UniProtKB/Swiss-Prot annotation:
GO terms for biological process: ATP synthesis coupled electron transport; electron transport coupled proton transport. The keyword Mitochondrion applies. It is found in: Mitochondrion. GO terms for cellular component: mitochondrion. GO terms for molecular function: endonuclease activity; NADH dehydrogenase (ubiquinone) activity; ubiquinone binding. Its main location: mitochondrion. InterPro entries: Homing_endonucl (IPR027434), LAGLIDADG_dom (IPR004860), NADH_UbQ_OxRdtase (IPR003918), ND/Mrp_TM (IPR001750). Keywords: Mitochondrion. This is Uncharacterized 50.9 kDa protein in ND4 intron 1. It comes from Podospora anserina (strain S / ATCC MYA-4624 / DSM 980 / FGSC 10383) (Pleurage anserina).
Length: 449
């Protein structure tokens, strides 16, 4: 039983070898006499008995190729059924593990687990069904069709059996060329276009929005509806406050720059633009240490910084009064609020359209919690609003609700809560930078000179 997995890969290759080994018959149809191999006409018209015999022999030959391919797939199905019967579902370890002799400097390991065994069985079931369903519909390039089918079976099984990441990637990408040819040659309408589509889609060549990583000013990624370009924002000096925020983050205490990673914390999306009614702003990510969109902010292993005084050397001293704030209408535990914001909350600095400013934009600090538009989530957002006694709940799209706090006065209540009940995940770094940004806004140091 030690070679069952190798048999799954070798049997289709043997079938390909047999199909390639049998050459087409050569027919020399002449019109001399019966002794020289000629055939007399069998009926009216231009059809001769020799041509009829040639067609019959060719059909028999093509059926012979199809039978070889079908028998090959059936043999593979039998082997996969044996593996399935002998598979021990009581363990989560790889089974039937086999290693090949060393090839150059690389070893090949095969094995199946409780998940891949079903894909192996499904592949070996689909292949004979595919051959039967196209037994009479494929009338040209029969040998090429059968060889591609058997080659695809080998590559698919290799994807599910190999235990090496590199070989998994190689076999997975190797499926694309034969699949491209199979669809392009034997597909129905628009087969060429379909083959290109599946090839490009699988290669994942979709155009992605570039994330600028060259300077701190690139914290501003894109304005909603692409009405304002990043370069224009930079030349107009509209991102000065964001640059200051980044500099403060770089020079902050080492807790913000630690590389330790906390597991089990839900990660949120941090890039992209957003809009709410007539509010259009650039979604900015406050990243500790580096101005890179989408990078995780790591949690300090030594615990959160002091909530009463945080010193940023050479820039600002930010002192806050730690106060407990609980609205009498709310029954939520303060630590529940903190934990919930750790998972679902968001601290943002945005550029809001405003005609009151020369640049046409106003720097806005926003705290929000987004949930799905369900009765249960709406009730929870109402309880959070009652807890703080501030903020509004709005619809955001067709499926989302948002609890939002924007004014500096109301944000002081938010800051007081998280100073008294600090965040413990990597989102605490977001909060600290958000807090520094509010100080800049209060001191009007964010304005363009």
């Amino acid at each position: 039983m030690s070679g069952l997995l190798y048999a799954l890969l070798i049997i289709p290759m043997i079938g390909i070898f047999f199909i390639l080994s049998f050459d087409s018959y050569n027919f020399n149809i002449t019109s001399n006499n019966s002794n020289s191999g000629s055939f007399s006409e069998a009926g009216a018209g231009k059809n001769s008995g020799g041509e009829l015999l040639k067609v019959l022999v060719i059909n028999n030959e093509l059926n012979f190729y199809k039978k070889i391919a079908f028998i090959t797939t059936i043999m593979n199905l039998i082997v996969s059924l044996i593996i399935y019967i002998l598979f021990d579902f009581s363990t989560n370890q790889f089974q039937f593990v086999q290693d090949a002799l060393e090839l150059s400097v690389y070893n090949i390991y095969l094995g199946v687990d409780g998940l891949s065994i079903y894909f192996v069985l499904l592949t070996t079931i689909i292949m004979p069904i595919a051959l039967i369903s196209n037994w009479n519909s494929i009338t040209h390039n029969i040998k090429a069709y059968l060889i591609i089918i058997l080659l695809l079976e080998t590559l698919l099984l290799a994807v599910f059996l190999v235990l090496d990441v590199l070989l998994f990637y190689i076999f997975f990408e190797s499926i694309l060329p034969p699949l491209f040819i199979l669809i392009g040659l034997f597909g129905s309408s628009n087969k060429v276009r379909a083959s290109f589509y599946i090839f490009l889609y699988t290669f994942n060549l979709k155009c992605k929005r570039a994330k600028y990583r060259g300077s701190p000013k690139a914290l501003v990624t894109k304005v909603q509806h692409e009405s304002v370009e990043l370069a224009w924002l930079m030349t107009q000096g509209m991102v000065k406050s964001l640059v200051d925020i980044w500099v403060i983050a770089v020079l902050s205490h080492p807790c913000l720059r630690t590389e330790s990673k906390q597991e089990g914390v839900k990660e949120q999306r941090v890039d992209g633009s957003s809009s709410s009614r007539n509010l259009e702003f650039v979604r900015c990510t406050l990243v500790a240490g580096k101005p890179v969109l989408g990078r995780k902010i790591h949690h300090c292993p030594c615990g959160p910084a002091s909530s009463k005084l945080m010193k940023v050397q050479g820039y600002y001293n930010i002192t806050t009064q730690a106060a407990t704030y609980t609205h009498p209408l709310s029954t939520l535990d303060p630590w529940f609020i903190t934990g919930f914001v750790d998972a679902e909350g968001c601290f943002m600095i945005g550029l809001t359209k405003s005609e009151l400013y020369r640049s046409g934009y106003q720097v806005t600090a926003i705290f929000k919690i987004s949930l799905r538009r369900t009765r249960k989530d709406y009730t929870l957002l109402c309880q959070i609003r009652d807890y703080f006694g501030i903020g509004i709940i709005t619809k955001h799209g067709e499926t989302t609700l948002q609890y939002m706090v924007r004014s500096i006065k109301d944000l002081n209540v938010i800051l007081s809560h998280f100073d008294a009940y600090p965040l413990f995940s990597q989102k605490r770094s977001d909060y600290i930078l958000f807090k520094q940004a509010i100080v800049l806004i209060k001191n009007k140091e964010h304005l363009t000179k």
